[in-house]
Curated annotation (Swiss-Prot):
<comment type="similarity">
    <text>Belongs to the methyl-accepting chemotaxis (MCP) protein family.</text>
</comment>
<feature type="modified residue" description="Glutamate methyl ester (Gln)">
    <location>
        <position position="297"/>
    </location>
</feature>
<feature type="transmembrane region" description="Helical">
    <location>
        <begin position="192"/>
        <end position="212"/>
    </location>
</feature>
<feature type="modified residue" description="Glutamate methyl ester (Glu)">
    <location>
        <position position="493"/>
    </location>
</feature>
<feature type="region of interest" description="The 3 Arg may form a positively charged pocket, which binds the alpha-carboxyl group of the attractant AA">
    <location>
        <begin position="64"/>
        <end position="73"/>
    </location>
</feature>
<dbReference type="GO" id="GO:0004888">
    <property type="term" value="F:transmembrane signaling receptor activity"/>
</dbReference>
<comment type="function">
    <text>Receptor for the attractant L-serine and related amino acids.</text>
</comment>
<keyword id="KW-0145">Chemotaxis</keyword>
<dbReference type="InterPro" id="IPR051310">
    <property type="entry name" value="MCP_chemotaxis"/>
</dbReference>
<comment type="function">
    <text>Chemotactic-signal transducers respond to changes in the concentration of attractants and repellents in the environment, transduce a signal from the outside to the inside of the cell, and facilitate sensory adaptation through the variation of the level of methylation. Attractants increase the level of methylation while repellents decrease the level of methylation, the methyl groups are added by the methyltransferase CheR and removed by the methylesterase CheB.</text>
</comment>
<dbReference type="Pfam" id="PF00015">
    <property type="entry name" value="MCPsignal"/>
</dbReference>
<dbReference type="InterPro" id="IPR004089">
    <property type="entry name" value="MCPsignal_dom"/>
</dbReference>
<keyword id="KW-0812">Transmembrane</keyword>
<dbReference type="GO" id="GO:0005886">
    <property type="term" value="C:plasma membrane"/>
</dbReference>
<dbReference type="InterPro" id="IPR004090">
    <property type="entry name" value="Chemotax_Me-accpt_rcpt"/>
</dbReference>
<feature type="modified residue" description="Glutamate methyl ester (Gln)">
    <location>
        <position position="311"/>
    </location>
</feature>
<dbReference type="Pfam" id="PF00672">
    <property type="entry name" value="HAMP"/>
</dbReference>
Length: 556
């Protein structure tokens, strides 16, 4: 029957049981506490009533004592033998004590009466208090009016005795109530003790019952489950797991049984997979060894190619630098030729200016020659006139002769100068023609140098492009060399990984060999052991993590 009850239901029943016990014990203790509270309230009420009533009684007795002293003082004053306090002081004191007694009694009446107190006794006490209080007030009035005989004739002692008798009866009643409350409190305490004992016994019985139920429902099945789990942890999968209940423990046993069956299938699959992985890893390791040697050869060839490309790159860079310098020299020669052409053009222009100036000088010389010719004619005419004049014109004839000689010499000099200037003009014209021819030649030289400069610039540009292209080829070869080196490293790492995979497959097979299956009986599964060794290049290579392998393969 217990095997059909769910664990949750059992726990709920336990909680309900202990909750009911808690409520019952709480109710009993609350009832006892309530009774104790009521008894304590009665005791506190009686104590407060007695305290206030006792204080009021004492105040009344003190007021009567003060009035007696005042009456005696009044008689002594009449006989003129009095001393001490005056009558007025004693009367004032008596009034104050009566007022205090009234306040205490009023406070006493404000306290609620216990239902178990006798209302007749309370009413009688009130009447006797009122009589005594009124008598004492009347004594104060009589003594204040000087009615000493009426003062002493009043039966105050009888009123006091009646009040005392009623007061004592009231105290006896309260004493009985006090004792009843004490007895009730003791009885409540005893009941609480017995209730506690009974509750403890019931709780202990419930605990024993709950423990037995838990041991039957939870502990023993869980111990069986723990034993099965320990056997599974040790690799023993041959023991069946029984399912004897339909509660949570039964569900746990069924789940554990399902887990054992799945684990049996998993171990079988892992063993087969480990064997397959071991075989594949061995083949991968052999292939990686061959690939590693070929990759190393390829890396060596690429390294030689990279060195040759570096030398070719250096040579092309030198040619490009020489072409660049030749282009700069041609450009400088072109600039120099252009400057020479400009100088020749200036010379041509200057020769033209000289020819123009020589022509002007020839014109001026012609003018001088004409002036000399006219002067000669004038001198000849003067000589003729002097001859006609005879002796008187002899001196004028001499002067005219000298002028004629000078005119002839001037004409001769002008002719010679004209001839020289004409010859100079002819030579200047010839020089101008030659200079113009030289200017044209310099222009041709400048054009030729410009074309040479352009050609050298194109050669330098082509050399630069060729140098950059060879640089790019060199970089590509260097990158290929670097990638090949990385590939060689990756191949080595792959070979190491294959060897490690082979070793891990062997370890995995050995690990799953711990489990014992029903089909094997007492035979022990033997895992293959790796006896291959990695090549020297792989053995010296540093092991890396699986993530590094993946990153390197992505680079490859």
């Amino acid at each position: 029957m217990f095997n059909r009850i769910k664990v949750v239901t059992s726990l709920l029943l336990v909680l309900v049981l202990f909750g009911a016990l808690q409520l019952i014990s709480g109710g009993l203790f609350f009832s006892s506490l309530k009774s104790d509270k009521e008894n304590f309230t009665v005791l506190q009420t009686i104590r407060q009533q007695q305290l206030l009533l006792s204080e009021s009684r004492v105040d009344l007795l003190q007021a009567r004592n003060s009035l007696n002293r005042a009456g005696i003082r009044y008689m002594m004053d009449t006989n003129k033998i009095g001393s001490g306090a005056t009558i007025d002081e004693l009367l004032a004191k008596a009034k104050e004590e009566l007022a205090r007694a009234e306040r205490n009694y009023t406070a006493y009446e404000k306290i609620p009466q216990d239902p178990r107190q006798d209302p007749q006794a309370t009413e009688k006490l009130k009447q006797q208090y009122g009589i005594l209080y009124g008598a004492l007030s009347e004594l104060i009035q009589l003594l204040g009016e000087g009615k000493i005989n009426a003062f002493f004739d009043q039966p105050t002692q009888k009123y006091q005795d009646d009040f005392e008798q009623t007061y004592n009866a009231y105290l006896q009643q309260n004493g009985k109530l006090y004792q009843i409350a004490v007895d009730a409190s003791n009885s409540s305490y005893s009941s609480a003790i017995w209730t506690l004992i009974v509750v403890i016994i019931v709780v202990l019985a419930a605990i024993v019952g709950v423990w037995m139920g838990i041991h039957h429902i939870l502990v023993r099945p869980l111990n069986r489950m723990i034993e099965h789990i320990k056997r599974i942890a040790s690799g023993d999968l041959t023991q069946p797991i029984p399912v004897t209940s339909r509660n949570e423990i039964g569900v746990l046993a069924a789940s554990l049984k399902h887990m054992q069956n799945e684990l049996i299938e998993t171990v079988s699959g892992v063993r087969q997979g480990a064997d397959a992985i071991y075989s594949g890893a061995s083949e991968i390791a052999a292939g990686n060894n061959d690939l590693s040697s070929r990759t190393e050869q390829q890396a060596a060839s690429l390294e030689e190619t990279a060195a040759s490309m570096e030398q070719l790159t250096a040579t092309v860079k030198q040619n490009a630098e020489n072409a660049r310098q030749a282009s700069q020299l041609a450009l400088s020669a072109s600039e120099t030729a252009q400057k020479g052409g400009k100088v020749v053009a200036n010379v041509v222009e200057t020769m033209h200016d000289i020819a123009s100036s020589s022509q002007k000088i020839a014109d001026i010389t012609g003018v001088i020659d004409g002036i000399a010719f006219q002067t000669n004619i004038l001198a000849l005419n003067a000589a003729v006139e002097a001859a006609r004049a005879g002796e008187q014109g002899r001196g004028f004839a001499v002067v005219a002769g000298e002028v004629r000689n000078l005119a002839q010499r001037s004409a001769q000099a002008a002719k010679e100068i004209k001839a020289l200037i004409e010859d100079s003009v002819n030579r200047v014209d010839m020089g101008s023609v030659l200079v113009e021819s030289a200017g044209d030649t310099m222009g041709d030289i400048v054009n030729a140098v410009t074309r040479v400069t352009d050609i050298m610039g194109e050669i330098a540009s082509a050399s630069d492009e060729q140098s950059r292209g060879i640089d790019q080829v060199g970089q590509a070869v260097a990158e290929m060399d670097r990638v090949t080196q990385q590939n060689a490293s990756l191949v080595e790492e792959s070979a190491s990984a294959a060897a490690a995979l082979e070793e891990q497959a062997s370890l995995l097979t050995q690990s799953v060999a711990v489990f014992r299956l029903k089909s094997e009986g007492q035979e022990e599964y033997k895992a293959p052991v790796s006896n291959k060794t990695a090549p020297a290049a792989i053995a010296t290579h540093k092991k890396t993590s699986a993530s590094d392998y993946q990153d390197n393969w992505e680079t490859f």
